Swiss-Prot record:
Family under the similarity heading: Belongs to the eukaryotic ribosomal protein eL24 family.
Cleavable signal peptide: none
Domain of life: Archaea
Zinc finger (C4-type): 6-36
Gene Ontology CC terms: ribonucleoprotein complex; ribosome
CDD domains reported in the protein's UniProt record: Ribosomal_L24e_L24 (cd00472)
HAMAP family, A to Z: Ribosomal_eL24
Stated role: Binds to the 23S rRNA.
Name of this chain's protein: Large ribosomal subunit protein eL24
Cofactor: Zn(2+)
């Protein structure tokens, strides 16, 4: 089975876990937790959030 990546934090998702969100235009988003989905819904940027993969790179916390 193929692994997915969380659309917000970048964490790998095991098959059968996480949340799937599909928009009407056909785009799909995968989330590892409700925390990631909530931040995505609020319009927060992953690169400005310290605990995300992009945030660690952008804020030099790697």
């Amino acid at each position: 089975m193929e692994q997915r990546k969380c659309s917000f934090c970048g964490e790998l998702l095991e098959p059968g876990t996480g949340l799937l969100f599909a928009k009407r235009d056909g785009s799909t988003y995968y989330f590892c937790s409700s925390k990631c989905k909530g931040n995505f819904d609020l319009g927060r940027l992953p690169r400005r959030t310290v605990w995300t993969e992009q945030g660690r790179i952008y804020l030099k916390k790697a």
